[in-house]
Regions:
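A short glycine-rich, Lys/Arg-flanked "PGG" loop and its adjoining helix->strand segment in the class I
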Residues: 118-130
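A short SAM/SAH-binding and catalytic strip from SAM-dependent methyltransferases
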Residues: 102-116
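A short acidic, Gly/Pro-enriched loop at the edge of an enzyme's catalytic core
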Residues: 95-103
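Conserved alpha-helix/loop element of class I SAM-dependent methyltransferases that forms part
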Residues: 19-36
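Class I SAM-dependent methyltransferase Rossmann-like catalytic core
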Residues: 1-21
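Core SAM-dependent methyltransferase catalytic element
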Residues: 183-185, 191-206
Length: 206
């Protein structure tokens, strides 16, 4: 899986396909990080959330991990303050030793098939403090009706496209909720966007 080819074009592609909806979802729970002292962003992509976070918290230490070297270059160009950028694949590579009291995985967990998803969440959870916050923006699947059918069609199109463009591992969306609960996190708040196609979650441990 590699987003290197998409990195230079990701921002305008996102705006073309989703407008500002994804960014609105990313920052929906930004205030939940106001007390964080050591923040980990995984799969940050081109750095739009990093910019918003830095505008609110210019001095907090932030670590950005991405498997894509090109995405890290784009994010680094907009990053400021005490920010560490690390190129790593969380399936193959060890997680840097630290204790994060906030983890952010926007548009990241939905890239993984169920087995890999379990491994990634367990690895990240081991690096989190006992009272850590975890923010997640990903696909969602409404419970019923036309919204659910619309989401299924959108998922199928997006996964097919990204599997071709990036060799994405996942073939369909896998709900991470059970894995998060198993690792001590509970859902604090969820906001739905685009009729439930996208959901922004605030999970809390402890």
């Amino acid at each position: 899986m590699s987003f290197d080819r998409l990195a230079p074009h990701y921002r305008w592609l996102e705006r073309l396909l989703a407008g500002e909806v994804l960014q609105q979802a990313r920052v929906a729970h930004l205030a939940a990080l106001d007390q964080a002292e050591n923040i980990l962003l995984v799969g940050e992509g081109p750095g739009r959330f990093l910019q918003a976070l830095r505008a609110r918290q210019p001095a907090v230490p932030i670590t950005v991990i991405d498997a894509s070297t090109k995405m890290l270059e784009v994010a680094r160009a907009v990053g400021s303050g005490p920010t560490t950028f690390i190129q790593a694949d969380l399936i193959r590579d060890p997680l840097p030793t630290s204790e994060w009291d906030a983890i952010v995985t926007h548009c990241f967990l939905d890239c993984f098939a169920p087995l890999s998803l379990t491994q990634v969440i367990e690895k990240l959870a081991r690096g989190a403090t006992p009272r850590a916050t975890w923010l997640i923006t990903d696909f969602g699947l409404p419970p019923s009706g036309w919204r659910r059918q619309r989401a299924r069609l959108a998922h199928a199109l997006m996964y097919r496209t990204f599997r071709i463009a990036t060799r994405l591992e996942a073939k369909q969306w896998a709900d991470p909720s059970a894995n998060l609960i198993e690792n001590g996190f509970q859902l604090a708040t969820r906001r739905a966007f685009s009729h439930g196609l996208i959901q922004a979650d605030h999970w809390q441990r402890g």
